């Protein structure tokens, strides 16, 4: 009696890879959507421009997804700046910035920044007043608190994504 061995390993591997790619697109797409919903709570152009830039990519060869935002300010929104930066890693004190009159929506930062100097509150108010007297749209700040739109999305979706993975791969 002879036994015939049929090798279906290629088909099994292809089915697993296809399921993995579909799962990665679904999970990463959910992360982008939830991050954007988290930014809906925030007001102003600063957050609106960031919301329009969240995206994901799936590397089908590595079977991995990357979710991110190419705008530098997305890092500041996530981790905070100045006195409010996560882990105390921000610049201390007050600083002055000037809104860039040449900026257009979606083109990047709408604020001119040249390295800046940290001031006391009173010094920053004086510098701002001088710049405003010169016709510039100057403002002072000591930073912004972290909003954590991405981390909050991850924390909220992690159980759902794990459940989704178990369901998708259980079917195989």
Task: Tell where the protein language model's regions lie, with residue ranges.
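Short, Lys/Arg-rich flexible segments
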Residues: 1-172
